[in-house]
Design a protein with these regions (language model features):
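Phosphate-binding glycine-rich/basic clefts of nucleotide- and phosphate-handling proteins
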Residues: 36-122, 130, 140-141, 146
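Catalytic phosphate/nucleotide-handling subdomain of diverse soluble enzymes
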Residues: 157-165
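Conserved mixed alpha/beta catalytic, RNA-binding, or beta-rich assembly cores of soluble enzyme
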Residues: 22, 122-123
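A short acidic Gly-Thr/Ser loop motif
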Residues: 21-29, 34-38, 50-52, 152-155
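Conserved phosphate-binding catalytic cores of ATP/NTP-utilizing and phosphoryl-transfer enzymes
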Residues: 1-22
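Conserved helix-loop functional segments at active or binding sites
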Residues: 8, 131-138
């Protein structure tokens, strides 16, 4: 039997009773409401707002702020993995990184770019959570809202759990 990754997360954590797992990977965010049995397709959602989307948004935000900025996907991914945050969870020090603008080496502040890029996944995730919760038995709505589990690489985004709540 093949099970979904979010269900595997809930099972590994022994949280298979009325949990809602949000597994933020590279290509997709997979959401699953867990009732204690293997979930059906109606208990799961998959959206394309995940790590790769954030990487692309970081590039877009930096190029919008710094015209001529030369950024690769790997650079954006490294910065995301080292500095990602949302909402009021900004780091104490600004996020200063090195990159080229029209061939000239620069060290520039991308704090607001990181935040804006990471926040682009919040609304699609919240909308999906609402859909899964409201589509479940009303008796379990509160339990699902109280038992949200973030998993995957995107779960490391500082402040994400609080913003989703």
């Amino acid at each position: 039997m093949i099970i979904s990754e979010p269900f595997a997360v809930a099972y590994a954590l022994d949280k298979i009773e009325h949990s809602l797992v949000i597994d933020i990977g590279a290509g997709t965010t997979d959401l699953c409401r867990v009732y204690g049995t293997v979930p059906t397709p109606n208990d799961q959602m998959h959206i394309n707002f995940a790590g790769d989307h954030i990487d692309a948004q970081i590039i877009t935000e930096i190029q919008r702020k710094y015209a001529g900025a030369q950024i690769t996907k790997d650079m954006a991914r490294r910065w995301k993995e080292s500095h990602s945050f949302v909402g009021g969870a900004a780091p104490d020090d600004p996020v200063i990184v090195d990159f080229s603008i029209e061939g000239k080496a620069m060290s520039l502040d991308i704090t607001d770019c990181i935040s804006a890029a990471c926040e682009t996944i919040v609304e699609p995730i919240v909308a999906s959570v609402k859909e899964l919760v409201t589509g479940s038995n009303p008796e379990y709505h509160d339990a699902f809202r109280r038992n949200v589990i973030l998993a995957g690489g995107g779960s490391g985004i500082i402040g994400l759990g609080a913003l989703i709540e």
